[in-house]
């Protein structure tokens, strides 16, 4: 691929990644403001145009009044209040459409112009398919709160968020494959140091770094899933103290074995797991970050410091979110923090894959 195509594709992937990150943020706002069930229909094309006239708004409001959320929770809501939550959900859906178009259309153009390698076609086709599935997944999630209960199914919410994170992950990975920022830097450093050989010890160290980094990425995905389950269950609104849950570190519901441990729909259990699994991952990340810093290789040392700082901020925002009964700003910062930590480890993965170039 020539340099102009690399630059164009890089800009496209950066814009797509930033849009997806914004989508995750707006999705968090939608959840925290309880606006997700304000639009009770899914019209991918005609839904682009919002209500304009008073008649349009009355029609939308009448549709909403037939929903479980209105009948069981918001039956005193005014049309002005309805407009507020409607526009939050509308912006979320509109941004989803824009993000989908920005990802899919350029891919089709690149494919038509034969600017992609075979492997790139497969990877970008996968991303395109995931984006389309995500649109259906969003409606599948919303639909769960429009029938009998005025609540979105928390497992579907977790699936919706995880799919967004997977797409984000794939976009970052594709961007790093194309521009190879760390590899270029390390090649230059390697040539300057006249390094002509790679020892067995270096290869073994590289393998350990790659394996542990992949384990951390998997654990981060798992923790993000638990965070989504906590959000979907409103489990952050119980036991709002730290480190105890009630009178002890382990809540009485668990001590009394009154929880069905095969289920993911118990508020107490989900909050307990999200708390302490998060602490466990944070300790692991800090240890790994210290290791990267001790290795004293410039690219790794910097990323190790970034990872350590981010995880300390993440623990702090998590505790603030819990203790202060889920304030929107703290909760959003906590959600974005998880994505930034994941991004950091995707960058670290790119570095350690070319670790021998540092020697």
UniProtKB/Swiss-Prot annotation:
Superkingdom of the organism of origin: Bacteria
Membrane topology: Multi-pass membrane protein
Catalysed transformations (reactions): Fe(II)-heme o + 2 A + H2O = Fe(II)-heme a + 2 AH2
InterPro entries: COX15/CtaA_fam, HemeA_Synthase_type2
GO molecular function: metal ion binding; oxidoreductase activity, acting on NAD(P)H, heme protein as acceptor
Transmembrane segments: 8-28, 94-114, 124-144, 159-179, 215-235, 276-296, 303-323, 328-348
Pathway: Porphyrin-containing compound metabolism; heme A biosynthesis; heme A from heme O: step 1/1
Protein localization: Cell membrane
Keywords: Cell membrane, Heme biosynthesis, Iron, Membrane, Metal-binding, Oxidoreductase, Transmembrane, Transmembrane helix
Record bears the keyword Protein transport: no
EC number: 1.17.99.9
Cofactor: heme b
Predominant place of localization: membrane
A GO term from the CC aspect: plasma membrane
Positions of heme binding: 274, 334
Tagged with keyword Magnesium: no
Biological-process GO terms, alphabetical: heme A biosynthetic process
Function: Catalyzes the conversion of heme O to heme A by two successive hydroxylations of the methyl group at C8. The first hydroxylation forms heme I, the second hydroxylation results in an unstable dihydroxymethyl group, which spontaneously dehydrates, resulting in the formyl group of heme A.
Subunit structure: Interacts with CtaB.
PANTHER family: CYTOCHROME C OXIDASE ASSEMBLY PROTEIN COX15 (PTHR23289), CYTOCHROME C OXIDASE ASSEMBLY PROTEIN COX15 HOMOLOG (PTHR23289:SF2)
Family assignment from sequence similarity: Belongs to the COX15/CtaA family. Type 2 subfamily.
Protein name: Heme A synthase
Organism name: Orientia tsutsugamushi (strain Ikeda)
Gene: ctaA
């Amino acid at each position: 691929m020539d340099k102009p195509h690399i630059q164009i594709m890089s800009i496209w992937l950066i814009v797509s990644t930033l849009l997806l990150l914004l989508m995750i943020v707006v999705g968090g706002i939608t959840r925290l403001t309880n606006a997700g069930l304000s639009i009770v229909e899914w019209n991918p094309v005609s839904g682009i145009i919002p209500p304009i006239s008073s008649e349009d708004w009355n029609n939308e409001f009448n549709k909403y009044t037939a929903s479980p959320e209105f009948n069981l929770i918001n039956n005193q809501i005014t049309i002005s209040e309805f407009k507020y939550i409607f526009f939050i959900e509308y912006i979320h859906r509109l941004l989803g459409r824009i993000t989908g178009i920005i990802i899919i259309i350029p891919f089709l153009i690149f494919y038509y112009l034969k600017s992609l390698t075979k492997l790139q076609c497969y990877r970008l086709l996968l991303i395109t398919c995931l984006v389309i599935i995500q649109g259906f997944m969003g409606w599948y999630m919303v639909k769960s709160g429009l029938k009998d209960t005025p609540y979105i199914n928390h497992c579907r919410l977790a699936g919706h968020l995880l799919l967004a994170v997977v797409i984000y992950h794939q976009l970052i990975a594709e961007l790093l494959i194309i521009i190879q920022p760390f590899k270029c830097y390390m090649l230059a450093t390697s040539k300057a140091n006249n390094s002509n050989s790679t020892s067995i010890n270096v290869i073994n160290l590289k393998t350990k770094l790659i394996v542990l980094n992949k384990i951390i990425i998997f654990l981060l995905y798992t923790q993000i899933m638990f965070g989504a389950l906590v959000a979907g269950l409103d489990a952050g609104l119980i036991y709002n103290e730290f480190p105890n849950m009630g009178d002890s570190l382990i809540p009485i519901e668990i001590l009394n074995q009154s929880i069905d441990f095969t289920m993911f729909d118990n508020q107490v259990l989900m909050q307990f797991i999200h708390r302490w699994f998060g602490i466990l991952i944070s300790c692991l990340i800090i240890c790994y970050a210290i290791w990267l810093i001790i290795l004293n290789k410039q690219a790794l040392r910097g990323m190790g410091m970034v990872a350590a700082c981010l995880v300390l901020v993440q623990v702090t925002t998590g505790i603030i979110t819990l203790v202060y009964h889920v304030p929107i700003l703290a909760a959003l910062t906590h959600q974005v923090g998880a994505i930034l930590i994941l991004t950091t480890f995707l960058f670290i993965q790119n570095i350690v894959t070319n670790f021998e170039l540092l020697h």
